[in-house]
Amino acid sequence: MKMKIFIITIVIALFITSIVEAQNKLDVKCVRLETCREPCKKQLCLLPMKCMNGKCVCSPSRKIC
């Protein structure tokens, strides 16, 4: 029984790690906040950035410090 719980814990930990790694691959940075003519590459976001009103913005507006 203890071995089964241990294996389930390992599987859950690996699953969470894979989700975090996938999220890190989605991170986009912004080069210029004032224009979206170039790809967004300066700010780190939890999700890819979008060009809104000529500016690169995080969507949702949560940044990774």
UniProtKB/Swiss-Prot annotation:
Disulfide bonds join C30-C51, C36-C56, C40-C58. One of its GO terms (cellular component) is extracellular region. It comes from the Eukaryota. Expressed by the venom gland. It is found in: Secreted. It holds the Pfam family Toxin_2. Keywords: Disulfide bond, Ion channel impairing toxin, Neurotoxin, Potassium channel impairing toxin, Secreted, Signal, Toxin. SUPFAM superfamilies: Scorpion toxin-like. InterPro entries: Scorpion_toxin-like_sf, Scorpion_toxinS_K_inh. GO terms for molecular function: ion channel inhibitor activity; potassium channel regulator activity; toxin activity. Residues 1-22 form the signal peptide. The keyword ATP-binding does not apply. Belongs to the short scorpion toxin superfamily. Potassium channel inhibitor family. Alpha-KTx 12 subfamily. Inhibits voltage-gated potassium channels. Has the structural arrangement of an alpha-helix connected to antiparallel beta-sheets by disulfide bonds (CS-alpha/beta). This is Potassium channel toxin alpha-KTx 12.6. It comes from Lychas mucronatus.
